[in-house]
């Protein structure tokens, strides 16, 4: 009996060892494959959207429908990026496709849904969706970029005989349809178009018709690419600051915005208005000088400007009654977004978002490397543990105090001065800031100018890795 028990124990032990060895062997062979996102919704017009496979392993794809196809986009040793391209839906029914992804032993299905074709006499760029919230629109805006130093160029030395002289004054070529299409082809979903409307403004505050025509032409190129556009008043702070206290300045502000509203009243959800740019009252209050009463006065003036802007737009005609609008915080500095003295305007349409600019740390984002000014010296690099902590802490504050409380946020400008810095450190900063913004449900809009990241001569990005890393962010953080 003892011998049988001993044999049983030895047999059991041997089986257990073999099982564990097999399990360990299987664990070593097991490769975790991640395919994301696994569901997509396309509008009736079709288009392309990206998904990723991590790690980068050979994959095969089978689509259940001929109108839905997969093509390779880009790859790194860590991740492969693919495009799902969907043809326009010409049927009156919602349609669905299943893409079967096979990577070694791993099989994953991606579900694709496309909206039905609805006969309409109204082009999409004129459409207002009644139930579209501003937060949902922010999601649609994806990654954004600025057409900077172009329609916003100013200077009394500029020849006023042709409006295009202003457009080229700060180094930009004349904007073409191909330049605008290049942003969309690169993957950007929204374009901010800063405009200095004071160029050639008449004494009775009438916008020059050539400027109005030019803005509308560039706007139409933008909308026809499927992008969302933002138009503002830029570089006119000296007189705009006087609006709360000077009747003539208020008349000028009101006149310009009424003309903008009238000209663009037919455009729909894909056009947003922004009242001004980086307005502050340093002569009244700064964080380093002035009393709490002075601060309340300075921030109150910006509140007044926002409310005046909303009132003008809402009381104008056409689609402006339900247009999604941006409002600004003091100096567009992040910390004033959640300052108790900042007040969101009253808006009967409830279609407002905050716009914030992010140039932190200032001695990297604003100054060139080694540049010396009275308040500091420009850093040549960025990317320490402390740098990332500062970035994430700032974006966490915005999310906690605004996004999580139902206030949508756009980071309307961010970038870094490239002087005396490598493209690698500029790329690291811009991509890191973009990811920190996007991952928290906000819309990042890179400040880009002639000679910046996007080459307006070739209509491509000079640093392909910059674009590749940027476009991997929406794949990493899919939105509904």
Task: Please place each PLM-identified region on the residue numbering.
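Substrate-binding cleft of secreted/luminal carbohydrate-active enzymes
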Residues: 385-463
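N-terminal carbohydrate-binding accessory modules
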Residues: 118-190
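An active-site-proximal structural segment forming one wall of the substrate-binding cleft
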Residues: 126-127, 170-191, 201, 205-234, ...
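Bacterial Sec-dependent N-terminal signal peptides
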Residues: 21-41, 106-125
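Active-site region of glycoside hydrolase catalytic domains
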Residues: 251-387, 396-416, 439-442
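A short beta-strand micro-motif common to beta-rich folds, especially ectodomain repeats
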Residues: 82, 93-105
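Surface-exposed binding patches on compact interaction domains or structured appendages
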Residues: 52-83
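Solvent-exposed, low-complexity, repeat-rich "mucin-like" stalks and linkers
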Residues: 34-62
């Amino acid at each position: 009996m003892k011998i049988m028990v001993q044999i049983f124990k030895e047999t059991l032990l041997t089986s257990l060892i073999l099982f564990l060895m097999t399990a360990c062997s299987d664990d070593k062979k097991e490769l975790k494959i991640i395919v994301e996102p696994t569901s997509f919704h396309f509008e009736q017009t079709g288009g392309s959207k990206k998904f990723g496979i991590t790690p980068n392993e050979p994959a095969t794809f089978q689509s259940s429908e001929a109108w839905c196809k997969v093509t390779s986009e880009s790859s790194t040793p860590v991740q492969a990026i693919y495009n799902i391209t969907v043809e326009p839906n010409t049927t009156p029914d919602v349609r669905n496709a299943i893409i079967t992804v096979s990577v070694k032993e791993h099989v994953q299905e991606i579900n694709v849904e496309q909206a039905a074709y609805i006969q309409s006499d109204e082009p999409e760029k004129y459409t207002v969706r009644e139930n579209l919230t501003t937060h949902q629109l922010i999601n649609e805006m994806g990654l954004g970029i600025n057409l900077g130093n172009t329609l916003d160029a100013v200077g009394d030395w500029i020849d006023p005989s042709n409006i295009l002289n202003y457009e080229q004054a700060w180094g930009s070529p004349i904007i073409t349809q191909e330049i605008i299409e290049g942003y969309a082809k690169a993957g950007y979903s929204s374009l901010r178009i800063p405009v200095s409307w004071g160029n050639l403004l008449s004494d009775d505050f009438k916008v020059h018709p050539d400027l109005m025509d030019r803005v509308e032409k560039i706007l139409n190129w933008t909308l026809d690419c499927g992008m969302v556009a933002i138009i503002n008043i830029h570089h006119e702070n000296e007189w705009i600051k006087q609006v709360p206290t000077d009747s003539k300045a208020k008349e000028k502000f009101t006149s310009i915005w009424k003309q903008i509203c009238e000209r663009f009243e037919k455009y729909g959800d894909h056009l947003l208005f922004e009242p001004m740019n980086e307005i502050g009252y340093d002569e009244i209050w700064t964080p380093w000088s002035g009393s709490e009463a002075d601060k309340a006065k300075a921030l109150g003036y910006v509140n007044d400007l926002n409310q005046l802007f909303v009132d003008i737009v809402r009381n104008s005609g056409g689609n402006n009654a339900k247009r999604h609008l941006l409002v600004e915080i003091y100096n567009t500095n992040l910390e004033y977004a959640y300052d108790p003295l900042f007040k969101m305007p009253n808006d009967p349409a409830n279609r407002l978002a905050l716009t914030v600019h992010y140039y932190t740390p200032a001695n990297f984002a604003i100054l060139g490397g080694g540049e010396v000014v009275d308040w500091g010296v420009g850093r040549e690099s960025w990317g320490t543990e402390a740098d990332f902590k500062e970035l994430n802490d700032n974006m966490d504050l915005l999310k906690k105090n605004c996004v999580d409380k139902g206030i949508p946020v756009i980071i309307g400008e961010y970038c870094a001065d490239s002087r005396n810095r490598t493209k690698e450190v500029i790329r690291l900063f811009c991509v890191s800031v973009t990811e920190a913004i996007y991952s928290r449900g906000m819309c990042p809009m890179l400040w880009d100018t002639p000679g910046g990241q996007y080459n307006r001569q070739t209509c491509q990005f000079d640093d392909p890795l910059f674009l590749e890393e940027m476009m991997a962010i929406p794949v990493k953080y899919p939105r509904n």
